[in-house]
Amino acid sequence: MNQNLLVTKRDGSTERINLDKIHRVLDWAAEGLHNVSISQVELRSHIQFYDGIKTSDIHETIIKAAADLISRDAPDYQYLAARLAIFHLRKKAYGQFEPPALYDHVVKMVEMGKYDNHLLEDYTEEEFKQMDTFIDHDRDMTFSYAAVKQLEGKYLVQNRVTGEIYESAQFLYILVAACLFSNYPRETRLQYVKRFYDAVSTFKISLPTPIMSGVRTPTRQFSSCVLIECGDSLDSINATSSAIVKYVSQRAGIGINAGRIRALGSPIRGGEAFHTGCIPFYKHFQTAVKSCSQGGVRGGAATLFYPMWHLEVESLLVLKNNRGVEGNRVRHMDYGVQINKLMYTRLLKGEDITLFSPSDVPGLYDAFFADQEEFERLYTKYEKDDSIRKQRVKAVELFSLMMQERASTGRIYIPVSYTHLRAHETDQSRM
């Protein structure tokens, strides 16, 4: 190894490469680990050094060299690589390995517009100093390499264009706790902050990505998911699409209750036109979901819900699978098929399920969620009404199709729209 190589430091100055310094960092990172070879990591990384290399690139090269050695026979390389990555992240965030005081860090980040100023409005300097005593930065060293990469990619506050990192893991955890308990009584809230911090930083509980990445920022993302109720009018459908884009950009996962949309061929404006059905509007929602990312953290994601008795259900159940063509598939959302006790009962008795367009059966969709007895009364009434468009399908065939698609895609969910379902009311042993 040529010890006359020049390296470019983070401040732009240059100096000769210091191999002893690299060795000391590796020695520190390997402490207490089993079956790891520092010299092996050094050999793999040294051959990639060149004159003028940045110190940050040296660090990333060493991290990759350690990560490449992870194997079933030598799993501790994952912790060696993780510790090196933590060291690198802290240097990027703070310019040094030791994190600053929590209060000083929060003040700086609020001034930069990276943290929500409510943190300084809700808590005093003394409270931040007390929170600082709760923090155990050594917990960073328990991460595996995969966990550190997840942390860096999804959760740490950062500039996703330039790659600048602004915090380390323990500040993330303590500030999420501070945000979540800020409205608790002053005399007890720090106890909750400490207990929550200890639980989340030792992996006893996990948090949704939107909260982990956004709750302490000006976005103030306290909810991980948003349910949007879509009506049957164009105004409501377009408002739903607009809300999807807005909430996806705010890091929220999306639930779309789209069961009110009328079926293909239904009359519009008294027969002036006929309806194009659900699928074009589902595609519209899918485009909205994928139009922007969840605050740069990950792509937008949505689950769309509709009732099992919808007239188009047989076409909707297959939207996720890999058969068919783009025109009759909407593959980039997940789906929830809403069922209730009556659907189960028809299955167990070997009877038919009758499919309707929600626009043709007034009150049925509302009763489906609000009053099961009223739903059953209306459902049987509409089944007998020959003036209403309908289709009868064997319950076992419909349930079989649903379960086949659920098994093949893994992304069809089955919420039961009956909160008082009891085991003795439906013989579930026959399911």
Q: What is the predicted function of each stretch?
A:
Residues 25, 29, 44, 48, ...:
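Generic, well-ordered alpha-helical scaffold segments in large soluble proteins
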Residues 419-426:
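Conserved small/polar residues in nucleotide/adenosyl-binding loops
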Residues 36-42, 56, 72-80, 187-192, ...:
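Flexible, glycine/charged-enriched surface loops at secondary-structure junctions
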Residues 96-158, 164-186, 261, 270-284, ...:
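Conserved, charged catalytic cores of large soluble enzymes
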Residues 6, 16, 226-228, 255-257, ...:
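Structured core elements
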Residues 143, 149-286, 290:
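Long, structured ligand/cofactor-binding scaffold of large enzymes
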Residues 1-19, 23-166, 391, 403:
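Often metal-dependent polyanion-binding catalytic scaffolds in large enzymes
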